[in-house]
Regions:
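A compositional signature for long Ser/Thr(±Pro)-rich, low-complexity
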Residues: 2-139, 145, 149-532
Length: 532
């Protein structure tokens, strides 16, 4: 071989090696290797740094120490704690602030000296069907200052609830470094099939080789144990189901008590009643919600509104007026709703409210996880609902993975001239996972929203915030996820409306993860207020 030819061959050989290395690094960065060896602790770059993200979104005065709770009497006890009014007269006028001091005590009757507990407050009158949430300030020393607003005449009561102690919150974070739930993936080729564990974080799935199915999940991180059968490949993944997993979680008995029914969501005793006089309505001169800069909706302090006679009344703007006005406003438009079963409730409530008819596949189950579409021919309007991508809890039955596409993928497909309204929501299906998973997804959605607004500046976009509930312990993460959404959508606040739904459920102290349909209707009407 001549020296010239040898030199050219070496250069070509070096070029091929560099090309392969670059391609491997690039693909690894974008999607990770198809098979990841957990035994050798090789993760995608996204997973290596994800263990501490999310903590920055915790409230002020909150820390996450390494120690675990072993003494069941050390946390705050609602029944041992107390609350009292700053103004002992208990008489207020419409619009005045009602201030309450809350002092927490532990199971030994000793005053708490640290903060970090999840304390919520509301004002209510069941006879008037009037309810409003309040704003709670953590003083960092075991005491909390709650501020409510006098919004209706008559006598009302104050309810202060210790939803989660700081020790419970620390435990909830710690077990999400493991996993409190798994998606099971089915791999199938011909008559051979196998079920394996799946998770959005590779570090959770230890002990076996993994299939990196991020690309198949629309670019959202997704991993499953590689099937043991040599007849099954990673691309044979077809279906998913869900399994809860409390086995092996690193919880002490004291922590288990805090995360079990009866260990959270307990009202602090106190017969605190106030009376409000003066029927003047100080909120009469507020603008129409449709004329309000959407940036305001991202920075509102509770309460943003209140229920009166079970009708929601926003405070900073005039809300829903009448159905005819809404129908006129929606004429020729399409509403696209993304999310979970709570936005599916929105879709369900809108069908009779707007007199639409379902034109997609009839729902054979109440837990419907396929896209749905309805038409309102009488005023040229259509609406669609799409479930989120994985992680998505489809329940105990098997569902095809092809129906679970990322919101960002749908947003990228919306045309430049479509007359469209978009509602985006993520929440409950992410509670079982470390907050990093939500953070990754919401950033991707925000990027796609930016692209959409550049392409179609006339599109109307809503971000439906989280809600609160008492039916299980995970609702603490509502504030963390809302903070993440706020951060991810920075620079878009004046173009996207944030719907602070937790004020609706805090006001009513909603128990179930699915709010009652009478409240869902009020949420939908509130959204419409910003359209017309």
């Amino acid at each position: 071989m001549s020296d010239g030819y040898s030199s050219r061959f070496r250069k070509f050989h070096l070029f091929v090696i560099l090309a392969v290395v670059f391609t491997t690094v690039y693909v690894g960065y974008r999607h990770g290797p198809l098979i990841v060896s957990i035994g050798e602790e090789r993760f995608s770059s996204r997973d290596e740094s994800s263990a501490s993200l999310g903590h920055e979104f915790l409230p002020k005065n909150f820390t996450l120490p390494d120690d675990v709770l072993t003494d069941p009497n050390a946390p705050a006890f609602a029944n041992s704690s107390r609350m009292y009014l700053v103004d002992i007269r208990r008489l207020f006028e419409i619009g005045q602030t009602i201030e309450v001091i809350i002092e927490l005590f532990d199971g030994y009757g000793k005053r708490r000296t640290i903060g970090g507990d999840d304390v919520r407050v509301r004002l209510y009158n069941d006879d008037l069907k009037a309810y409003a949430s309040g704003h709670v300030i953590d003083n960092g020393n075991g005491s909390y200052t709650a501020r409510l607003v006098a919004l209706w005449e008559g006598k009302s009561r104050i309810d202060v609830t210790l939803y989660h102690t700081s020790e419970a919150i620390k435990a909830m974070y710690r077990i999400r470094e493991q996993s409190v739930g798994y998606i099971i993936g089915k791999f199938k080729a011909g008559d051979v099939e196998e079920d394996t564990h799946c998770h959005p974080l590779a570090r959770i799935l230890k002990g076996r080789e993994l299939c990196n199915l991020t690309l198949e999940n629309g670019g959202m991180s997704w991993y499953c144990w590689k099937p043991s059968s040599i007849k099954l490949l990673c691309h044979d993944w077809t279906e998913v189901t869900y399994r809860s997993s409390s086995h092996g979680l690193l919880l002490t008995n004291a922590e288990k008590g805090l995360l079990s029914p009866g260990g959270y969501g307990i009202s602090i005793p106190g017969n605190v009643e106030v009376e409000v006089k003066n029927s003047s309505n100080i909120y009469m001169n507020v603008p129409e919600c449709a004329n309000v800069n959407s940036a305001i909706t991202w920075n509102q302090q509770s309460p943003i509104g209140y229920y009166y006679n079970n009708v929601w009344k926003p405070l900073h703007c005039k809300g829903f007026t009448n159905l005819a006005k809404i129908q006129k406003c929606l004429k020729g438009k399409k509403l696209v709703i993304f999310g979970d079963s709570t936005t599916r409730q929105w879709f369900q409530s809108l069908e009779p409210f707007l007199k639409c008819r379902l034109v997609s596949e009839s729902w054979s189950t109440t837990k419907w996880h396929k896209p749905a579409k309805a038409l309102c021919e009488h005023f040229d309007f259509s609406m669609e609902w799409f479930p989120n991508a994985l992680p998505f809890n489809v329940g105990k039955r098997w569902e095809s993975r092809r129906y679970l596409r990322p919101v960002s993928a749908y947003l990228e497909e919306i045309g430049h001239n479509e007359n469209i309204i978009v509602v985006v929501h993520m929440y409950v299906h992410f509670i079982a996972y470390h907050p990093d998973v939500f953070w990754d997804r919401i950033q991707r959605i925000a990027r796609s929203v930016r692209h959409l607004l550049q392409r179609n500046p006339h599109v109307k976009i809503f971000m439906k915030g989280t809600h609160t509930f008492l039916s299980f312990d995970g609702d603490y993460f509502n504030s963390v996820f809302d903070n993440m959404s706020h951060q991810a959508f920075k620079g878009l606040h004046d173009k996207v409306v944030f719907l602070k739904i937790r004020d609706f459920t805090d006001a009513k102290k909603t128990f179930d993860i699915h709010p009652p349909f009478e409240d869902v209707k009020e949420m939908v009407k509130y959204m419409f207020s910003y359209l017309c």
